[in-house]
């Protein structure tokens, strides 16, 4: 028996290497394998949003006007969620609800599921794009890892939360004012601001803003002067090979200000990555908790005392009453299918009124 040792020669016209070479070759806008997911999904998501906000009404799902055609502007137009009666249907154009009728599909809220799913895959494709580009340019994949934060928030808010509720109806609609309404909804129905995961998310995002401002100002303040220009933008050569700012000077400054300072660039920049990404992940975990209707902090003793003593009130008890007011007003307006009618005497009033 003869055993041949060696490489198997590929056919000249083998399709996979040709496609791989074309996708990953160096060009002005990199395509890559991730681009097969990113570009079509991003195109359809953006195109669907522009189409929906321009032409499509929310009259049949929310009883609202939501398009430019109906008189909305950029801040008030939205692609709204499907009606509550459609539960978690994918609302495919060819599905049993629309039966291939594009107009009916739009009226039922099919564009929302179209946007949510294509938007989610577009974000995932963008993260894969960062992974794919990291290797050829010899980077570590921290950009892609950090982008998992926004993806986690998007998936938790737009997909996981409504999956835990009765339908897509309770997810945010895609629009500026619609997102604001959803934030008020989260507060009124879940007391979102008093949840520890929301607090960690706020600390992460605002902490990252502070770190970003401090870092940018410090680097700008400690740049080496290598020219005689009159201002920052003309005094420095952007192509110089050596380091352009002084870590030692920055460390000395912040040591005097705070008593402590970063002495290692890698730890400093990792911390700037860690704080916002962790904050976004904590927010996403908190929203998953809301999908399961997990409760926030309850200070029942304060509620009982406020109910018994007209002169006792705390910011917490005022917020609880505010939440009840949001629920009473919003449920009747936002869920017309429930036919809720609240008489004036049951609407909450604080002790101070």
UniProtKB/Swiss-Prot annotation:
Catalytic activity: 2 a plastoquinone + 4 hnu + 2 H2O = 2 a plastoquinol + O2
Function: Photosystem II (PSII) is a light-driven water:plastoquinone oxidoreductase that uses light energy to abstract electrons from H(2)O, generating O(2) and a proton gradient subsequently used for ATP formation. It consists of a core antenna complex that captures photons, and an electron transfer chain that converts photonic excitation into a charge separation. The D1/D2 (PsbA/PsbD) reaction center heterodimer binds P680, the primary electron donor of PSII as well as several subsequent electron acceptors. D2 is needed for assembly of a stable PSII complex.
CDD domains tied to this protein: Photosystem-II_D2 (cd09288)
Binding site for a plastoquinone: 215, 262
GO cellular component, one term: chloroplast thylakoid membrane
Protein's UniProt keywords contain Acetylation: yes
Protein name as catalogued: Photosystem II D2 protein
Gene for this chain: psbD
Residues that hold Fe cation according to the record: 215, 269
Protein source organism: Zea mays
Note: 2 of the reaction center chlorophylls (ChlD1 and ChlD2) are entirely coordinated by water.
Modified residues (N-acetylthreonine): 2
Cofactor, how bound (note): The D1/D2 heterodimer binds P680, chlorophylls that are the primary electron donor of PSII, and subsequent electron acceptors. It shares a non-heme iron and each subunit binds pheophytin, quinone, additional chlorophylls, carotenoids and lipids. There is also a Cl(-1) ion associated with D1 and D2, which is required for oxygen evolution. The PSII complex binds additional chlorophylls, carotenoids and specific lipids.
Residues that bind chlorophyll a ChlzD2: 118
Subunit annotation: PSII is composed of 1 copy each of membrane proteins PsbA, PsbB, PsbC, PsbD, PsbE, PsbF, PsbH, PsbI, PsbJ, PsbK, PsbL, PsbM, PsbT, PsbX, PsbY, PsbZ, Psb30/Ycf12, at least 3 peripheral proteins of the oxygen-evolving complex and a large number of cofactors. It forms dimeric complexes.
Post-translational modification as stated in the protein's UniProt record: Only phosphorylated in mesophyll cells, phosphorylation increases when cells are grown under high rather than low light regimes (70 vs 900 umol photons/m-2/s).
Residues at which chlorophyll a PD2 binds: 198
Membrane spanning residue stretches: 41-61, 125-141, 153-166, 208-228, 279-295
Family note: Belongs to the reaction center PufL/M/PsbA/D family.
GO molecular function: chlorophyll binding; electron transporter, transferring electrons within the cyclic electron transport pathway of photosynthesis activity; iron ion binding; oxygen evolving activity
Compartment list: Plastid, Chloroplast thylakoid membrane
Lyase in keyword set: no
């Amino acid at each position: 028996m003869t055993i041949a040792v060696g490489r198997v020669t590929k056919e000249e016209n083998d399709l996979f290497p040709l496609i791989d070479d074309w996708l990953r070759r160096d060009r002005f806008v990199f395509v890559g394998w991730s681009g097969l997911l990113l570009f079509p999904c991003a195109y359809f998501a953006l195109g669907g949003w522009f189409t929906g906000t321009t032409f499509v009404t929310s009259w049949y799902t929310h009883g609202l006007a939501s398009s430019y055609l109906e008189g909305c502007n950029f801040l008030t137009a939205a692609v709204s969620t499907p009606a509550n009666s459609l539960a978690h249907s994918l609302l495919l154009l060819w599905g049993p609800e629309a039966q291939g009728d594009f107009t009916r599909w739009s009226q039922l809220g099919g564009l929302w599921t179209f946007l949510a799913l294509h938007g989610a895959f577009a974000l995932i494709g963008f993260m894969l794009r960062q992974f794919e580009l990291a290797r050829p340019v010899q980077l570590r994949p921290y950009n892609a890892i950090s982008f998992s934060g926004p993806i986690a928030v998007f998936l938790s808010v737009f997909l996981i939360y409504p999956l835990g509720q009765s339908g897509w109806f309770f997810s945010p609609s895609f629009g500026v004012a619609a997102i604001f309404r959803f934030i008020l909804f989260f507060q009124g129905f879940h007391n979102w601001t008093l949840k520890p995961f929301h607090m960690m998310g706020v600390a992460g995002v605002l902490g990252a803003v502070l770190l970003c401002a401090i870092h940018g100002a410090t680097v700008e303040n400690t740049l080496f002067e290598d020219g005689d220009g009159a201002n920052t933008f003309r005094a420095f050569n952007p192509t110089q090979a050596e380091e352009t700012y002084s870590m030692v000077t920055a460390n000395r400054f912040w040591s005097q200000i705070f008593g402590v300072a970063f002495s290692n660039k890698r730890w400093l920049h990792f911390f700037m990555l860690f704080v916002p990404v962790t904050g976004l992940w904590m927010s996403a975990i908190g929203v998953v908790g809301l999908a399961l209707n997990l409760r926030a902090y309850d200070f029942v003793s304060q509620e009982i005392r406020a109910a018994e003593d007209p002169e006792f009130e705390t910011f917490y008890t005022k917020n609880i009453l505010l939440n009840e007011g949001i629920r009473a007003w919003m449920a009747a307006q936002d869920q017309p299918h429930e036919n809720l009618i609240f008489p004036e005497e049951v609407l909450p009033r604080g002790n101070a009124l």
